[in-house]
Amino acid sequence: MKQISSIFIILCSISCGGPRGNWSDPRVILISIDGLRGDILNNSTYTKDYPNLTRLMTDGEYCTSVQTVFPSLTYPSHTSMITGVTPAKHGIVNNRPFMPKNNFVDWYWYADSIEVPTLITKAAQNGLVTVGVSWPVSVGAKMDWMLPEIKSVNDTISTIDLVRQHDRPESFLESAKVFGVVPKDGNPSGYNRDLLLHEIFMDAFVRKAPHLSLYHMIETDLIQHKFGKSSNEAKDAFMFMDSLVGNILAFLDDNKLWESTTLIITGDHGFRNYEKQVSLNRLFEKEGWLTLNNGSISDWKVVCLGSGGSGFVRLKDPTDQEFKKRVRLLLSEQDAFEILEQRHMNGALWAS
């Protein structure tokens, strides 16, 4: 009984104490709905399907033609949101770091991979209270209250245990259990995961009154990848996210916080339907330039790391000009794609 009481006191001190803002202070809430596209506004039933987004468009300002970064992936885009620079400058040039020997299974989870200052670091320097829930590239970020986005890529540890290792402050996730937010066996997926993340965000936001909130909604992206951007499933996913946004609006309404609140709803990238998938690494394997062993890359002279609708081709020895010519010739003979080299990219795409 004494041990249980000690644990509860520790968790309660984490949950009830620590940095807290003031509701009269100015605050920014940045919500990213993964895969949110401007063309969903073309749906004739938009106002009925998405009443909360419609309200924000009516009462606030909106833009339907935002240009994302290159490459148009979740992690580069989210990092540009909080740095204001392109991936070429902030260093998160893909969802996954270039690690062919581990089959590119790891992602850019860690905030120390970002090469420039962020909103998070600036907020910390100015003594502002911050909350982050499932924000990409946030593991290790100096946020006051943070549940990072990270996923287990092997059988040695579960995703929920990884999150427990990296939340801030220590036992932030456990403290949410004390408040009845997280179920004891909480390792959900799909809509249940987004619902759980929403409960955690609302719990932290209400109790901590942060100056800066970063909140990432996920399932809209996964549904569009699985069923297509124009599917009924995608429409349902956006309707679900709209309802979560509605909970935040209701809290701001009930507590009369609009005068001190700037709320930003955005997406990170769009979607295009496709019929074919190109595997350049299979092409390189046929040429003997890449070796696979039980589906894993064991050796390579050239390799491609996919980046959504594009891919980065790298040579192990970039100084081998003769081999570079052979690779360029092979790629130029394919009709499924075009080749862009750095000299072809304008500043909007790849400003370094």
Model feature map: region roles:
Residues 1-24:
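Bacterial Sec-dependent N-terminal signal peptides
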Residues 18-61:
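Active-site-proximal N-terminal segment of extracellular/periplasmic enzymes that hydrolyze or transfer
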Residues 23, 40-41, 191-215, 220-261:
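A long, amphipathic alpha-helix that forms part
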Residues 29-32, 63-65, 80-82, 130-134, ...:
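Structural recognition of the beta-strand scaffold that forms the well-ordered cores
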Residues 37-43, 66-68, 78, 105-110, ...:
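Second-shell loop/turn segments in exported
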Residues 86-228, 335:
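His/Asp/Glu-rich, glycine-adjacent segments
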